[in-house]
From Swiss-Prot:
<dbReference type="InterPro" id="IPR000711">
    <property type="entry name" value="ATPase_OSCP/dsu"/>
</dbReference>
<keyword id="KW-0375">Hydrogen ion transport</keyword>
<dbReference type="InterPro" id="IPR020781">
    <property type="entry name" value="ATPase_OSCP/d_CS"/>
</dbReference>
<dbReference type="InterPro" id="IPR026015">
    <property type="entry name" value="ATP_synth_OSCP/delta_N_sf"/>
</dbReference>
<comment type="similarity">
    <text>Belongs to the ATPase delta chain family.</text>
</comment>
<dbReference type="GO" id="GO:0045259">
    <property type="term" value="C:proton-transporting ATP synthase complex"/>
</dbReference>
<dbReference type="Pfam" id="PF00213">
    <property type="entry name" value="OSCP"/>
</dbReference>
<keyword id="KW-1003">Cell membrane</keyword>
<dbReference type="GO" id="GO:0005886">
    <property type="term" value="C:plasma membrane"/>
</dbReference>
<comment type="subunit">
    <text>F-type ATPases have 2 components, F(1) - the catalytic core - and F(0) - the membrane proton channel. F(1) has five subunits: alpha(3), beta(3), gamma(1), delta(1), epsilon(1). F(0) has three main subunits: a(1), b(2) and c(10-14). The alpha and beta chains form an alternating ring which encloses part of the gamma chain. F(1) is attached to F(0) by a central stalk formed by the gamma and epsilon chains, while a peripheral stalk is formed by the delta and b chains.</text>
</comment>
<keyword id="KW-0139">CF(1)</keyword>
<comment type="function">
    <text>This protein is part of the stalk that links CF(0) to CF(1). It either transmits conformational changes from CF(0) to CF(1) or is implicated in proton conduction.</text>
</comment>
<keyword id="KW-0813">Transport</keyword>
<dbReference type="GO" id="GO:0046933">
    <property type="term" value="F:proton-transporting ATP synthase activity, rotational mechanism"/>
</dbReference>
<keyword id="KW-0472">Membrane</keyword>
<keyword id="KW-0406">Ion transport</keyword>
<protein>
    <recommendedName>
        <fullName>ATP synthase subunit delta</fullName>
    </recommendedName>
</protein>
Length: 181
């Protein structure tokens, strides 16, 4: 089973429990904390990957680090991953859980490629225009500056791409010209 599938399976189980308890956002914040610790402390994963370190010591390390900050359900999920030797799925679990929670709320992330950095006002306008097109209530806009676009915007929401860039228009024109020969 792929890493993403494993992380998703645990995320779905935890999300269902969170929904029952009415704590989906609380669990998300807790998992974001765990993800942040793993991402800012690469040594942690190195230690957890050590085959010479006993599994119970690895669990104790994480328990000591997180127990005061996590609900029992989130801590138990992390412990379960550790027991099964799937420490590398902890960060993936956080991402998958966030995706589930966002889907439930009708929120998606939009990557907007532009020639120059966008202002907050421009990001808000783009979110307002593209959220309904993507079938979402709200979009979180992440701006990526790409000078190859020449001008205009390219917006990616999930697997959908809205290409209004000059580069995209030129490519479409080229295809039409080649097809018309």
């Amino acid at each position: 089973m792929s890493n993403k599938a494993v992380a998703n399976r645990y995320a779905v189980a935890l999300f269902e429990l969170a929904e029952e308890k009415g704590q989906t956002d609380v669990f998300e914040r807790e998992l974001e904390l765990v993800q942040e610790v793993f991402e800012t402390t690469p040594q942690l994963e190195t230690v957890l990957a050590q085959p010479g370190l006993a599994a119970d010591k690895k669990q104790a390390l994480l328990r000591d680090a997180f127990q005061a900050h996590l609900s029992p359900a989130v801590m138990n999920t992390i412990n379960l991953l550790m027991e099964r030797g799937r420490y590398s799925e902890i960060v993936g679990l956080a991402g998958e859980y966030k995706q589930l929670n966002d889907d439930k709320k009708g929120i998606a992330e939009a990557t907007v490629f532009s020639v120059k950095a966008l202002s907050d006002s421009e990001k808000n306008q783009i979110a307002a225009v593209f959220a309904p097109k993507a079938g979402k209530r709200e979009l979180r806009v992440v701006n990526v500056v790409d000078s190859a676009l020449i001008g205009g915007l390219k917006v990616r929401v999930g697997d959908r791409v809205f290409d209004g860039s000059i580069q995209g228009q030129l490519k479409r024109l080229e295809k039409q010209l080649v097809a018309g020969q």
